C-alpha cells in the first residue's frame, strides 16, 4: 500500500512541477523573474526525478535495500540540484524586488552553496551504500539550512515591506520544507516511517512553484 501511495504521489509531483515550470518558461519573457522561476521549477523536478524514479522502482519491485547504487546516486544529484534551486530563488528575490548591489549577500549565498556542494562531493558520505553516515548527513545540511534560512528572511521582509500579496507566503513554504526535511535527515534510518515526511515536504515545494505560477498568470492577465 505504501509503495502505491508513494509512487502515485511522486508521479503527480514530478508531472506537476515540470509542467508548471515549462509553462512559466514559455509564458514569460527572457530575463524576467518568471522565466527564472520556471527554470528553477524544472531544475527542481528534473533533479528530484533522479531519486524518485529509482525509489518508485525499488518500492514496487525488490525493495529499497536492493537499489542502493541508483538511490544513492539520485540523492547525490538531488543534493546538488536543490542547492542550485535556492541560488536561483535568491535571484528571483532580486528580480522581483528590484534589488541592486548587496554584494556581501550574494557572496554569502555563493559561499554557502559552494560549501554545501563540496561537502556533498566528499567520499565520506558513502552515497552508494545502504548506510550513509548520520554525521555527514548533518554536516552537509548545515550550510544548506543556513542558505534556506537566509532566503526565508529575505522573502519574509521583502514581501512584508512591499505588501506583496502574491508572494506573502513564499517564506512559509521554505520553512515547511525544512521543517519536514530535518527529521528525515536525523531519524529516518532509525524509523523508516519518518521518511513519509518527505510527502508534506514535497507538497511545500509544489506550493512554492504554484505561488510563482499564479503570480505570473495574475500579472499576465493585467497586461492583456
Identify the role of each PLM range.
Residues 1-18:
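Hydrophobic transmembrane alpha-helical segments in integral membrane proteins
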Residues 25-37, 93-105, 130-133, 156-168, ...:
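Membrane-interface helix-boundary motifs at transmembrane edges
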Residues 39-53, 74-91, 103-124, 140-151, ...:
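Alpha-helical transmembrane segments of multi-pass integral membrane proteins
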Residues 171-217:
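Terminal transmembrane helical module of multi-pass membrane proteins
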